Regions:
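Phosphodiester-processing cores and adjacent nucleic acid-binding clamps
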Residues: 1-350
Length: 350
């Protein structure tokens, strides 16, 4: 979606509308490295009667604490939350990717995956994934090690991915399509050898085929390159939301891989993201002489009195000001903002 900053050009509402028009009963969001759009996506899809699958295309490096230019991007990996526990675990990993792993991009590592894998479905991703990268570097043994590692962690919730983007452009096809054909062949062999299911997927960055040119301009903005630069980054123009019929035509020999995508959708539960406001608890001093039921509100009143008197000083005896202060406190009590007041006081206290 557009939440993959300067990389995705699919607005959420039109994306959901298009998915529904194509007869899809579920759709996933996997923005690059972030979860900025999950609430908007979840609400929009739910309202439209399409099951929202919340995920992220994370960047995985060997050690998230090391800031090494050789690993500034990391390998791509798809993580999907199949239940609320998985959603919370994904939120934790993505948060750590920013607070601990950020270096050019938000990055996680396998230590985090081991720690927070519960409730998550894992897919091997595009050509930027660790398995495809090993295959493209002719290191099949490494690809096998990676597959085994992820299968040991995720079990039946680990899936290998097949992708095909035939553009008809010889230059683009040489860079992407030919590599995809080679990678897919080995992935099918690895899937059979290690008993891992595989899916057919499409790397969606925009909604309709005719949106490809606009997306191409967006990539130029992202990379700071001119449109007529022959060496700039180019997509295949196949990265749109394809219909089930188009996907079946791309993979006529693997209908089972298309069906497996529905298996993933069925695994993902419906869960709500809304809840009551979460406010921290700020216990007043132990020697504060008020009954427990009145404790926090009374402590806040004491703070307000002291601060208001300090602000208005000698003018506190003016009846108009006293009435204004009383009205402000009455409104504060009505809105039950005592906890919030303690929270803001804690943030600004020196």
């Amino acid at each position: 979606t557009q939440y993959s900053i300067l990389d995705g050009a699919a607005a959420i509402k039109p994306l959901i509308k298009r998915a529904k028009a194509l007869g899809m009963n579920a759709i996933a969001i996997t923005a690059h490295g972030n979860m900025y759009g999950v609430k908007n996506f979840h609400d929009t899809a739910t309202e439209a009667g399409v099951k929202p699958i919340l995920g992220c295309e994370v960047y995985v490096v060997k050690n998230r604490f090391e800031k090494d230019k050789d690993e500034k991007a990391g390998d791509h990996l798809i993580l999907l939350a199949k239940n609320l526990e998985g959603y919370h675990n994904l939120c934790k990993m993505v948060s750590y990717s920013f607070t601990e792993g950020f270096y050019y991009k938000p990055r996680i590592d396998k230590q985090l995956i081991e720690q927070y894998h519960e409730g998550l479905i894992c897919c091997s991703a595009c050509l930027g994934g660790e398995v495809p990268q090993a295959i493209m570097h002719n290191d099949i043994e490494e690809a096998e090690r990676v597959v085994q590692w992820f299968k040991n962690i995720f079990g039946e919730d680990y899936y290998l991915e097949l992708q095909l983007h035939p553009s008809g452009d010889p230059q683009k096809d040489a860079d992407v399509y030919e590599n995809q054909l080679r990678v897919n062949k080995v992935i099918l062999e690895l899937a059979a050898k290690y008993g891992v299911k595989y899916i057919c997927s499409n790397d969606v960055h925009f909604i309709l085929a005719e949106d490809a040119v606009a997306h191409d301009h967006l990539i130029c903005l992202n990379t700071g390159r001119d449109l007529d630069d022959p060496n700039r980054m180019r997509y295949t123009f196949q990265e749109y939301l394809k219909s089930p019929e188009e996907m079946a035509a791309l993979f006529p020999d693997h209908p089972e891989a298309l069906a497996t995508t529905l298996e993933i959708a069925d695994k993902c539960e419906d869960y709500k993201l809304t809840h009551a406001p979460l406010m921290p608890n700020f216990p007043p001093p132990e020697d504060f002489p008020i009954a427990l039921g009145e404790l926090r509100e009374s402590f806040v009143k004491k703070i307000e009195d002291e601060e208001m008197l300090a602000k208005i000083g000698a003018c506190a005896t003016v009846p108009e000001l006293e009435e204004l202060v009383a009205g402000d406190k009455e409104l504060s009590d009505r809105l039950m903002v005592a906890k919030q007041y303690c929270y803001l006081k804690d943030l600004t206290y020196k």
